[in-house]
């Protein structure tokens, strides 16, 4: 049974912790066999992937990867049977608004949207200082620490996940998520980010927000969710945090069960395609060998 706080909408009206070869027909049979063997090794790599989906996680403003990992302890227990989570720490130190200094080494930010180098989710029309560096940082993690299937973000991290999904839709990033979880997310008000929301995003997403959130009001999270066609909504009665109680447990389990099933089905199809490719390569090798013998 789905959680009583979980309400599903389909918006059809608007679409571990870290700091971060071609063969010639005249080729001999042995050489062709060697080439086929090399291709086989390359094509068999997906079978080595674990039977869990892997999720890259992005923390909120003034947090870091360890902080988010600790806060998601219960959530990770709920979903750990189906998913593995890797937590990144943003490359930028937070500038403390009280002093204008960057002495809060453990407090990190993905970008700043105010002229004083700080960030506020409700700010509109501001800059996006440091965003490109963070984008490159996450793209490198996605490539070097992958493969990953999904993204998860909280607060500013969820805003970032929304931007990454939009950029992926427009093929403006090397990141290609199959799904995403966005908790206390919102649309970025930075002018440089407006184009990321031009297309409706179709991957499955879970949007989580608190009805009493006074940092990112629920309306801001709802506005973000409207840009996703296959959005599942999980409301909770609390404030600005990632909920993980018995009331949300089944929603998380159901979501990750579905994503794991989709991942395994796609993996099976890919492996079947690889077998067909290898069978075709073997037949071509036999034909090339026969043609070579005839010419002798």
Predicted regions, residues:
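Catalytic histidine neighborhood in serine/cysteine hydrolases
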Residues: 226-243
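Short alpha-helix in the alpha/beta-hydrolase fold that links the catalytic acid
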Residues: 70-73, 194-195, 217-226
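Serine-hydrolase catalytic machinery in alpha/beta-hydrolase-like enzymes
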Residues: 49-148
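Gly/Ala-rich beta-loop-alpha elbow adjacent to hydrolase catalytic centers
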Residues: 152-161
